[in-house]
Amino acid sequence: MRPSGRNNDQLRNLKVTHNFTKHAEGSVLIEFGDTKVICTASVVAGVPKFKKDSGEGWLTAEYGMLPRSTHTRMDREAARGKQSGRTQEIQRLIGRALRASVDLTAIGENTIKVDCDVIQADGGTRTASITGASLAIADAIEYMKQNGMLDEQANPLLSQVAAISVGIYNNEPVLDLDYDEDSNAETDMNVVMNSNGGIIEIQGTAEGKDFSEEEFAKMLGLAKKGIKEIFATVF
């Protein structure tokens, strides 16, 4: 039995609020159960130096957690003077996943800057960030079209992207782990897929106990099922 009482293949309640903030070209509040993340997509003229005169745009992502998004308060990373290795890893994951969904040549020499800010954490913050950010990017691209920054016929969005966690909890494969499950899981895995059914990234780690190829296949099957439900619900 899962602590939440959910079935092993059951997602948490999923809710998306578009235009959650006033100023960003695209903004979304995404909620997976008690995990809540604000995802914004800002359009900035110009590109980094390594993209200058390439005719291509760029997309980059930042990730952070509010001090009391967790059970006990943590210091802001800005106050500590550096980002943790975890934060840097998650930012790179989000950026990689989202760049796989956008035709950078189609946005010209503009940069889409994604910010994912966790306001409440109960497991699955990186996967919620990817899903919410994909929605925010779609809104930002629509803003660019409506405001003459892109031709209305342009189609920079190659696909949508969603992500979910799966794992082995109490010797059983489960979908969409909350904090209680994640902190006690024998295996934790994050799966990122696009709306065409393609796999973008898989991160899987055994926590003190290995997992079999059969268990891996079951977890991947759960992830595919969950991501299909996410696309059907919020995209």
UniProtKB/Swiss-Prot annotation:
Q: Which Gene3D superfamilies match?
A: GHMP Kinase, N-terminal domain
Q: Which reaction does it catalyse?
A: tRNA(n+1) + phosphate = tRNA(n) + a ribonucleoside 5'-diphosphate
Keyword Transcription regulation applies = no
**Annotated positions binding phosphate:** 86, 124-126
Q: Which GO terms describe its biological process?
A: rRNA catabolic process; rRNA processing; tRNA processing
Keywords per UniProt: Nucleotidyltransferase, RNA-binding, rRNA processing, Transferase, tRNA processing, tRNA-binding
Q: Which domain of life is it from?
A: Bacteria
Q: What is its EC number?
A: 2.7.7.56
The UniProt GO MF terms for this protein read:
3'-5'-RNA exonuclease activity; tRNA binding; tRNA nucleotidyltransferase activity
Function field: Phosphorolytic 3'-5' exoribonuclease that plays an important role in tRNA 3'-end maturation. Removes nucleotide residues following the 3'-CCA terminus of tRNAs; can also add nucleotides to the ends of RNA molecules by using nucleoside diphosphates as substrates, but this may not be physiologically important. Probably plays a role in initiation of 16S rRNA degradation (leading to ribosome degradation) during starvation.
Subunit note: Homohexameric ring arranged as a trimer of dimers.
PANTHER family, alphabetically?
A: EXOSOME COMPLEX COMPONENT, EXOSOME COMPLEX COMPONENT RRP41
Write out the similarity annotation: Belongs to the RNase PH family.
Q: Name it.
A: Ribonuclease PH
Q: Which organism does this sequence originate in?
A: Francisella tularensis subsp. tularensis (strain SCHU S4 / Schu 4)
